[in-house]
Amino acid sequence: MIQRFVIGKPFPTARVVRDLPAETGPVPYLTPDGDGWQYVMQEKDIVYGLGEMPRGLNKRGWHYETNNTDESEHGENRLSYYAAHNFLLISPADGSGCIGVFVDFPGKVSYDIGYTRHDTLRFATAEPNYALYLITAPTAAEVAKEFRQLIGPSYIPPKWAFGLAQSRFGYKTEADIREVAAQYKANGLPLDMICMDIDYMQSYADFTIDKARFPDLGKLAADLKAEGIRLVPIIDAGIRCDDNDPVCREGLEKGYFCTKEDGTPFVAAVWPGRAYFTDFLRPDARAWFGKQYKMLTDLGIEGFWNDMNEPALFYSPERLKAFFENAAALSRKDNLDQNDFFGLVRSVMGLMNAPEDYRSFYHDTAAGRVRHDRVHNLYGGCMTRAAGEAFQTLRPGQRTLLYCRSSIIGAHRWGGIWLGDNHSSWSQLLANIQMMPAVQMCGFLYSGADLCGFSEDTTPDLVLRWLEFGLFTPLMRNHAGAESREQEFYRFTDVLPAIRNMLDLRYALLPYLYSELMKAALEDAPYFRPLAFDYPADPDAREVDDQLLLGEGLMVAPIHTQNAHGRTVYLPEAMKMLRLRSVSDYDEEVLPAGRHYLPCELDEVLLFIRPGHTVPVAQPAANTAQLNDTALTFWRFAPDGQPAPYRMYTDDGVTTVHNRPEHWRIVGQ
């Protein structure tokens, strides 16, 4: 059951697709607490949710803010990342039924989940104008399904988007891109996408191409596509301030940019320096921005990643001027005490994403003129919507790849997400594992992290262990920052055979992974989920937060600690374990329910088949276009000797025609 409660006068956010009447009575389960609400937790209650947030599957024991932030310092003590996923799922230990809470509010929401008081969950919005949805059902899985139905269907990418993407901030020329493609081929590694960061642009300006470094982007895209590889360029939120740029001129002339209180365009700096910011909350401005992608789709580009759309702000001219004045005053001193020195450091860091800057510009909406900070979390999702809506016109009937950094619930209908600028660390691998079910509860099925880590230097063992989890995530992208060690998979020659085997395993499992993603999208089912969703009465399953159920029939238990030669795995029921070194080289063993220490060397991955299930397996291929999903073998666990057929989904992978009877077939009988 879903109940809607209206507090104050909510801003129309378009986050849900069902029009529910507002309840007039008290809110069940929750108690008013000043400017927010509280819920008293029992000792072993679990609180899932909040999507892209730090810490474990169970969010108890910390405080969080959904305030979309360009947060490069990932870690368990952060309060907010790039997304506003205001959904909580409370699973009581006594089995009395589960509760979902969705706070439909476009500004900052604060959560205290046992941080101040161990037994108390509390949340509050920045102002008292929001809609509150309460979902109750017997199980967590049912609550999650009802929530997905409330917020609408998830974006479905093209099938080639399930192949490997190679990316780096630092591919500066066409020759760099061609070299990556050539090296993957020469080393026998599959590849479906190469992502371009801002270096392909002229002076880092959106919707431009640096002709000196990329003289014929259309030919490059066509040449790569002939090899089964798509070129996927980045688009940022800011439009460079440049009177000679026709996009900038048109945006100014037609008033499509956000403005300051006095009505003049708001300016802040990002990669190209000073930039304007499209007012994505306006339908006409969204349509205008969306049509700009045409200059790239006309060149044969079929996929994009949107970035910097929190929006990230490096500095505003006003704050930069104040900083220089302060620095000039300090420059007259030849001896800075700790107050002066650390004050200078704080003033430098305070230039970026300053709250004062977010309070200094406005949006013109159907509900009136509104200051940005009051609707801040809508911005990135509305940019996603601008692109998603445009692709319906620019590429009618075709799927266009789109994934973005900043998001809010509702944006999942237009694109996927990646989990931002993580680090090359073992703790970030664990964070990736634990975030996946949470973001997918919020509808973002096409999602994944930067494999091996974006910033800092990765290591060969971290590359392999991260890949051994990443091969199961819908978005599988190896992405690194400009200052990081080069981490294309072919560079790790000492572990290259194992890397090749793991990439081959990803492609071999695509008949299963693609089918399960499509079931999740078309039937509001989970792709990744905690063990407790399927084993709610098992107290040990409720405690597990580093094993995940994957689709109907699999469980994964990644290794996420360095120098480990195995791990302890909890099985809620008997399962068949596969210890895979490659698609054709593996050990299998039926293990009873309970805890098991299982050896797993660096070149191995553990996979578990649940009883009564079958997994279709294809032959590995160089890319998704070459994958043959009709010549299949099957891994199965049928302990009772009965057939365990698999319901497999197959379509053309490129058009928006989904869920026809001919797309489904029964295999493995």
Question: Which sequence ranges carry the predicted segments?
Answer:
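Aromatic- and carboxylate-enriched substrate-binding clefts and catalytic-loop regions
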Residues: 33, 190-499, 534-535
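Glycine-rich, histidine-containing beta strand-loop boundary motifs that form or position
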Residues: 41, 91, 102-105, 113, ...
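A conserved hydrophobic secondary-structure block that centers on an alpha-helix together
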Residues: 77-78, 154-157, 167-215, 219-221
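A residue-level signal for conserved active-site and pocket-lining positions in enzyme catalytic cores
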Residues: 87, 147, 184, 224, ...
